[in-house]
Amino acid sequence: MKKIKKLLAVFAAVGVALMLPLQTMAAVDLNAKYDISTNQIQGWPAGPDITSDTGILMYADTGVVLYNKGGDEQRYPASITKIMTLLVAVENSTMDEKVTFTETGVRNVTADSSNIGTKVGEVLTMEDCLHALIIQSANDVAAQIAEHIGGTEQAFIDMMNQRASEIGCTNTHFANSSGLPDDNHYSSARDMALIFREGLKNETFRTVVGTPDYIIQPTNMNSQQRILHTHHPMFAPESGFYYEGCIGGKTGTTVAAGHTLVTGVTRDNTTYIAVTMRGTELSNSCMDSTAMFNYAFENFTKTEVNGGYVFLPKGVELNSLTEKSENTNGKTETGYYFGDYLIGTASVAQATDTPVPEPTAAAEDS
């Protein structure tokens, strides 16, 4: 069944790709500077001045954004691309599948490319591959996953772009499965947060991104264990940047992309996603993300409403919000606004009249 689903996904992605116009080269302006747009909301808590070009802090359950600095501006994602590679992979494979490496993957085993030193003909499980993809950021594994699932790398890339469109990404185009430099490979902080948010709905995705350490056992062509440890400082307890409640994420870096970082944190049943793009150093990206998480936890109160939650700036009362409701598909969807800014949503099933049964003949005779 999983194999049939995978083939259908490939055919659908190829069909969509044929119908879409060719993508033009992205006009990524690396010299542009952006303001913190959420600071312009009257009465909104002032957000931190991060050093990364762009950044966003999103509530995972609803996608509500509490902090936004150029979040819709295109930037090169580098290896945080692999979050989408992981999502498409877990949706179209099983963890016990056998992946045989070909020249497609092994050509990425070079001194200047992150890899796990695979060889042509080597066999790993999909579980091994997915952990190497996220923990080691292995480019050889990314390419091989793409070919294994898509039949060709390009077919898998088409699946990535189709999935991005389905999720609601509007400033993203993928040209490969690894994040290696390509002028036509770009995304935005908001889009990457949306992709990570979608992934968190999948149990296998959550397991892989939430694993800081993994051992690949000896294979048919490698007699040694491969011991993997997270590259994400905010996820590593021994790191000075470790953040309590971190549930994983992904690092990335190239010359053009600078340092990119996706991080998830859960505290008190509240999960936030922070994304920073084009940081100057990984340490600065970690400090930017930490500042955004601290800002959210210190300045907002998660308040329950009928059918959902809103995030109130501390000191703001629920009755000061504006509510806008509409009925769709048997539900009442309500948006809660702080001024004109959406800070929460709720969904409640509409009440229906329960028909009263007519008395039966037996009941009438009793």
Predicted regions and their residues:
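Active-site-adjacent loops and short helices of periplasmic peptidoglycan-processing enzymes
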Residues: M25-R190, L194-E203
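Generic "edge-of-domain/loop-turn" microfeature
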Residues: P21-M25, T62, V106, Y272, ...
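Domain-terminus/edge residues, biased toward the C-terminal soluble/receptor-binding domains
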Residues: C169-T170, P181-Y186, R190-S366
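Sec-dependent N-terminal signal peptides of Gram-positive bacterial secreted proteins and lipoproteins
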Residues: K2-M25
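Hydrophobic alpha-helical membrane context
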Residues: A17-L18, T94, M292, F300
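Hydrophobic alpha-helical segments, especially transmembrane helices
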Residues: I4-L7, I83, R267
